[in-house]
Amino acid sequence: MQPMARGIQRSVTMIEAMVQALQYEFMQNAIVASLLVSLACGLIGSFIVINRMVFISGGVAHAAYGGIGLGYYFAFNPLWGAFVFSLVMALAMGWVARKYQQRSDTLIGVMWALGMAIGIMLIDLTKGYKADVASYLFGSILTVPRQELWLMAGLDMLIIILLFLLYKEFLAISFDPVYATTRNLPVDILYLTLVAAIALTVVMVMQLVGLIMVIALLSIPAAIAGQYVRDVPQMMAVASGLGMVFCGVGLALSYSFNLSSGATIILVASIAYLISLAFRR
């Protein structure tokens, strides 16, 4: 009974520490950021899983580092650099995926590496102390400022409006692009629009878990949801809810045990995915 009692006591202590931490603005910002990002991941991540666009999403995430390098080198907000650069690279990768379907993996891999290389070189060439470079790679949810929460909320609204306007069209190109073509839908333009939405979501998620682990938070909740629901709106709702749970649990564990928040969130999500596979079988 003693190990169980110690475990219960440790859990109570962790909960008390989290309740106390909620008094501070940085923790409140972290919770709000988790909710906003989880919503975006559930909505866009579902289409990533349905369309099997995980590799493109990973390429966009890593290529965004080139935009961060541009921001440092030319002395403007690296986040805006990541937005613009990832959007351009996403459209390029989407065009490659549509035009060169047989060789797209290789070409996307080259663009992935190119973006990272540009970012690393520009940061190396930048003079002065670069304090927060690591936060873009590994995430720093506890340092998200309040003004960026408004940016995240705006991006969430943009994604919701986009899906409201083009939901049926996105479904058509996801499940039967040939039928979509016969219905005179602009399949290529719709595909590039979806890729652009992925780029915007990547930059949002980057602030929580970092570029290295962005793709996990985008795909794991949706992949779990896809095993148990077949309706896309339900998949989006479940994926968003799971993302919120993973972020909340990961944030609590990282704060209690002084661990990296981004890595802890992804660890929680990965364990949940493995458990879901076991139950599925």
From Swiss-Prot:
Record has Cytoplasm as a keyword: no
Protein keywords: Cell membrane, Membrane, Transmembrane, Transmembrane helix, Transport
Residues making up the signal peptide according to the UniProt record: none
A GO term from the CC aspect: ATP-binding cassette (ABC) transporter complex
GO biological process, one term: transmembrane transport
Record bears the keyword Transferase: no
Coiled-coil portions: none
Membrane topology: Multi-pass membrane protein
Transmembrane segments: 30-50, 54-74, 76-96, 106-126, 153-173, 198-218, 235-255, 259-279
Subcellular location: Cell membrane
InterPro entries the record matches: ABC_BtuC-like, ABC_TroCD
Family: Belongs to the ABC-3 integral membrane protein family.
UniProt-listed PANTHER family: ABC-TRANSPORTER METAL-BINDING PROTEIN (PTHR30477), METAL TRANSPORT SYSTEM MEMBRANE PROTEIN CT_417-RELATED (PTHR30477:SF18)
Protein name: Uncharacterized membrane protein slr2045
Organism (species): Synechocystis sp. (strain ATCC 27184 / PCC 6803 / Kazusa)
Phylogenetic classification of the source organism: Bacteria, Bacillati, Cyanobacteriota, Cyanophyceae, Synechococcales
